[in-house]
Amino acid sequence: MRHVIFRVEKERYGLPLSAIREVVLPPATFSRVPRAPRAVVGVMNLRGRVVTVVELRELLHLSDASSPMQKVVLLDRGRRDLGLLVTEVDGIESVEKVSPPPGHPSPSVRGITRLRGLAVTILDPEGVDGAVAALFGHK
């Protein structure tokens, strides 16, 4: 199965290509959403559609760092537009085997794979969507 591989800081992540609508550059500024959870960067206008953008680093509870977030990965979620702010997109790769994640992983994590000797955490698009919905108190 083909996956979009991207980085959040130095960590590599992947999402199934079938779950991605497109990858775009972030706007110079996002429109802030009052009282939004910390992970919500804001909203952006993309060709007339309002897209909620979430900082994946914050959603996954990764440490704060200073690397600039340079890409927005847009999930194909039907009627709702959701963007994930990431450090960089590395490309599209074929992922053959995904091992179960160790310990008690987040529902956002499907498993772990290795590409060119490097670990890649494969995310579950439904789990990511659910984590974002939970930020707003939805189930």
Question: Where are these predicted regions, by residue range?
Answer:
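An acidic, low-aromatic, low-complexity terminal/linker signal
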Residues: 1-139
